[in-house]
Amino acid sequence: MAWIQIRLNSTNEKAEQISDFLEEIGSVSVTFMDSQDTPIFEPLPGETRLWGNTDVIALFDAETDMAEIVRLLKEAKHLDSNTAYKIEQIEDKDWEREWMDNFHPMQFGKRLWICPSWRDVPDKNAVNVMLDPGLAFGTGTHPTTALCLEWLDSLDLKNKTVIDFGCGSGILAIAALKLGAKSAVGIDIDPQAILASRDNAEQNGVVDRLQLFLSDEKPSDLKADVVVANILAGPLKELYPIISQLVKPNGNLGLSGILETQAQSVCDAYTQTFALEPVAVREEWCRITGNLKTL
């Protein structure tokens, strides 16, 4: 069966309203896509997990009168002269198979591979993390996640404790455990992230060494040898008092989710208590690492 797709450029403020309206007028499915290839990170409590510039994509069956759909969208003021949209016919495909074909094992550093569960691992002697793309939030494909994974791979984590602050899928905590860490803690504001991290830890056989907490439920005396936080520059600066207290004396800190243009302001926030290393840059994103200073 063929389908007709309409794609409308919108904003995160309007996307959900448009989605609801499209479903009311007969769409069989509605999805959101980033208009500018920017990543989604953890939202603040109560916020919708959307991009700043969002495309709303709706599928209708092939017999749908799309001129009438456009008329209804305009009548409801979801389309105007400033709204870009595109209508096209879509072939029926095995969408699940096509989606799966897009994901391949990826290597980070010298030892670490992230592999979808339906793929054979390229090196059985490597450190292999099995992680399937899904609703939560980090599978290694974005430069910030890659920078953090490569940093963890470069550390000697044997018998170390690790905190993954803003754990999302749990990818960083799980990678640390499989790279030799004694134990890890994942912290997030989103209950869905806690569930996803636990599921992924079970899949990788490390759930017995991973503790998970919502951010407002973490122990007050929590500290670790290594702390990694892949969130955003603004929250990293705002959360400096909290994040810095999580690092043991001489412990390692890794921060990412930071645009290169924001690196200096984040460094300025942390340099008072951390001896920072040169900033690592990939594409327009960067990673800041350092050690907690001791008096």
Swiss-Prot record:
Keywords: Cytoplasm, Methyltransferase, S-adenosyl-L-methionine, Transferase
Compartment annotation: Cytoplasm
Principal subcellular localisation of the protein: cytoplasm
Highest taxon, organism lineage: Bacteria
Binding site for S-adenosyl-L-methionine: T145, G166, D188, N230
Reactions listed under catalytic activity: L-lysyl-[protein] + 3 S-adenosyl-L-methionine = N(6),N(6),N(6)-trimethyl-L-lysyl-[protein] + 3 S-adenosyl-L-homocysteine + 3 H(+)
EC number(s) per entry: 2.1.1.-
GO MF annotation: an example: protein-lysine N-methyltransferase activity
GO biological process: methylation
GO cellular component, one term: cytosol
Enzyme class (EC, first level): transferase
Pfam families listed in its UniProt record: PrmA
TM spans (from-to): none
InterPro entries in the cross-refs: Ribosomal_L11_MeTrfase_PrmA, Ribosomal_PrmA_MeTrfase, SAM-dependent_MTases_sf
Family annotation (PANTHER family): ELECTRON TRANSFER FLAVOPROTEIN BETA SUBUNIT LYSINE METHYLTRANSFERASE
UniProt xrefs under NCBIfam families: prmA
Similarity-based family: Belongs to the methyltransferase superfamily. PrmA family.
General function of this protein: Methylates ribosomal protein L11.
HAMAP family attached to this UniProt entry: Methyltr_PrmA
Name used for this protein in its record: Ribosomal protein L11 methyltransferase
Organism: Haemophilus influenzae (strain 86-028NP)
